[in-house]
């Protein structure tokens, strides 16, 4: 494991003025979509460090995702699911939930928007229909508890809820979950992200741990699952444990970054169970992470997540760092030479 202290990365100008709930790179460019508790969704062009546009909503914006380079979807505390188009400054409401909407994903495979809410439902929407739920809503799927995090890979959807429940769906048949699971971690789930190769997912908790899980229920596949501790420190003989807020997979190598309330970003090689890198400490909690489509940039949201209640805090900031291959490329396993 290598620890160095490179710069935090380039800081974007015009950052949000309140907590950053998520940020995501486009699949086609260096555009970055950012949702925030200041009721705004912002689109940045990272290559020119410029704000391309923003929308003001009726409440805190809790998540956002891209549709294409200049449009996407946003959800939040005002219960609404919106399509937002930046190059023409237009938004429409696809529909609503009964409580705050925590998560949104767009499935390119299914052509649907998927939302997860604190009303204990997941809803699917067809954005090609005209505005309004009667024309765009595809289905509503009851969950055991409030939805905290979701992730997609291909036709698979993983939904993590309060109460440590995990439901795994096939988007082609949403009537029942393919699998109903319980988190293998003892404490509340903070983030779930699918492996880019589609074989499973990583799940993080408020108690400084990440679990590596596999979809295949065979004994051989399940024997590969494990969990590890991270984002902790020892102080005066006590272990101080921090929530792991964010997980982001590298699109080329399948290694992944975690961001915690300790202000650190770590890079992990999940297959070899090793930490590859730790970046120097950021000003405050890491609330969100995203790799660019080619894996050469990592966007880091440094934004206090109120794990210690009200206190004086560093201002919200978005850093974009260049990623060196040595930080994210798995190291080959070294086998001892057989005795002569």
Curated annotation (Swiss-Prot):
Gene3D superfamilies on file: YVTN repeat-like/Quinoprotein amine dehydrogenase (2.130.10.10)
PROSITE patterns per UniProt: WD_REPEATS_2, WD_REPEATS_REGION
Tissues with expression: Expressed in actively dividing tissues, early in organ development, in young leaves, lateral root primordia and root meristems, flower buds, flowers and siliques.
InterPro entries: G-protein_beta_WD-40_rep, WD40/YVTN_repeat-like_dom_sf, WD40_repeat_dom_sf, WD40_rpt
Pfam families: WD40 (PF00400)
Region listing for Disordered, in residue ranges: 1-20
WD repeat spans: 15-54, 96-135, 142-179, 239-278, 281-324
Single biological process term from Gene Ontology: cell division
Compartments it resides in: Nucleus; Chromosome, Centromere, Kinetochore; Cytoplasm, Cytoskeleton, Phragmoplast; Cytoplasm, Cytoskeleton, Spindle
Induction, per UniProt: Cell cycle regulated expression with a distinct expression peak at the G2/M boundary.
Gene Ontology CC terms: Cul4-RING E3 ubiquitin ligase complex; kinetochore; kinetochore microtubule; nucleus; phragmoplast; spindle microtubule
Phenotype of gene-disrupted mutants: Survives only in heterozygous state. Displays defects in development of male and female gametophytes.
Keywords annotated in UniProt: Cell cycle, Cell division, Centromere, Chromosome, Chromosome partition, Cytoplasm, Cytoskeleton, Kinetochore, Meiosis, Mitosis, Nucleus, Repeat, WD repeat
Keyword Cytoplasm: yes
SUPFAM superfamilies: WD40 repeat-like (SSF50978)
Self-association and partners: Part of the mitotic checkpoint complex (MCC); interacts with CDC20-1 and CDC20-2. Interacts with MAD2 and BUBR1.
Family: Belongs to the WD repeat BUB3 family.
Role noted for this protein: Has a dual function in spindle-assembly checkpoint signaling and in promoting the establishment of correct kinetochore-microtubule (K-MT) attachments. Promotes the formation of stable end-on bipolar attachments. Necessary for kinetochore localization of BUB1. The BUB1/BUB3 complex plays a role in the inhibition of anaphase-promoting complex or cyclosome (APC/C) when spindle-assembly checkpoint is activated and inhibits the ubiquitin ligase activity of APC/C by phosphorylating its activator CDC20. Essential for gametophyte development.
Name of the protein in question: Mitotic checkpoint protein BUB3.1
Gene source species: Arabidopsis thaliana
